[in-house]
């Protein structure tokens, strides 16, 4: 899946880039990544206008004061809540032990092909899982680690292999994969197996990558040779899914969806205490896009006050706490396992409760100002 061009505009947002410095987490929790981006860019614009537009300095000073009031009112309320616990804030003290199994691919990349690639990817993941020596609460296999002839939902031999490891490790499993549906379609799934070896439920990816997981207007574009690399169109899932793991709740988003705040926030609203991103980043190559994706996961972890588990088939995989700190991560194009103890969290932030309310407020105010100027003129 060549996700590079489709995701590039999302990666450029200021709020995702600045998480590399872990700046002002309270702003992320109050306004979210997009709100943070709006604030930084608007402040920059106001400063430039104030410096360059001598005739309108009073107007821009007044606009700046209004803008600062709009920023600091909700931010002050959040900081007040942080001090006096006005919102429900319940960080569970019990940790869960989690393992990311990063099985890699023998021939990563959208255009690369090798014999029995899918079978070899599955075998790598099952063999790495067999190397885990002690019991764990949750084992995670990333996107594309199973599927087609190695789908646990369809092929009993695959489910049996996994059930043996479930029993040995007394673990829940969350497993990514894709499933052909007739000749023209497929599903991209996250399959949840409980610690008794039963397939409990699955999450189906809702947001396909344009020209990577489906071809818009395929019937009119079939003459383009390179589109043969995408022979099937993904069937969209309908909603978020919450998986119950004992007393804890987790949810998955799949790959490209991790670029969009609404899927992670939607899972938090549905009750998720841990967010898992299943992804296949093979087409990113040695570029910086794997690191950029982790930055996005960090921004979303801070904004929603949730730990995020970033599981990538070819790397980089990472454990990220609710403050956006990377606890541990893997390298690119390696076969390895990554262990961490994670604290489930079920508190709320202004962003997780109200979404991009600040952005909409600014749009409404701008529209009112526009109408007022039209009336006065």
For the regions a language model picked out, list residue spans one by one.
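Single conserved hydrophobic/aromatic residue that forms the stacking wall/gate
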Residues: 1-7, 11
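Juxtamembrane membrane-water interface segments that cap and precede transmembrane helices
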Residues: 14-27, 344-346
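Membrane-interface loop-to-helix entry segments
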Residues: 26-42, 351-361
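Hydrophobic core of alpha-helical transmembrane segments in multi-pass integral membrane proteins
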Residues: 46, 68-82, 360-371
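Structural signal for the C-terminal ends of transmembrane alpha-helices
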Residues: 47-56, 370-376
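Membrane-interfacial entry segments at the cytosolic side of transmembrane helices
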Residues: 56-70
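Hydrophobic alpha-helical transmembrane segments in integral membrane proteins
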Residues: 67-101, 109
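Solvent-exposed soluble domains appended to multi-pass membrane proteins
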Residues: 112-118, 138-377
